[in-house]
Amino acid sequence: MKNHLSEYFNIEKGHKNLDFVDINRKKDTKLFLDPYLIKFGVSDICKEMAEVVQSFEIELFDSFRTKNFSRQKELFAHSSERNETKFGYGNGRNGKGNSISGMQKAFESIKTILEENPNLNSLPDLVILVKNFSKDGLSDLLANLLYKILLRYTKDQIEENGVAEVFVKSSSFANEW
């Protein structure tokens, strides 16, 4: 059975020569989008992604500092898991991504955290400081925020690797930043 993308599309370069993660199509790969690699990356795509992440961080932390609960709810709409990335701890179609209410509950402690750390302004810090918000949850959030960029990158990789026909299931951009 052809579980990995390279097998499915008959790309014979070998994983070490691919410019993308050769995910398993049937279950999640235990990898996560890393905000530090994005922030400090030197490529054009990393710089573009870093701008998106930074704009979201500003909005999120500002919504907590100003106690704008409706804005927080809007921002947490970006937290659910995108199953098509196949990153994280899921083991099938349904991953273990966050819901809006789950994020609100997990982030109840952030008010106190921000009072104690007024200069806090980085999403990765929240993985350490907010109970029930893990690297998997952060990766899901980043996948949503960066969805259009990731989709464009995927299309570029499809062309670069000569994959002739690809069925792309239409996906909602509702959670994209």
Which residues fall in each region the model found?
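Long, contiguous, compositionally biased segments that the model treats as domain-scale units
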Residues: 2-164
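Interfaces and regulatory segments of ATP-dependent nucleotide/adenylate/phosphodiester-chemistry enzymes
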Residues: 175-177
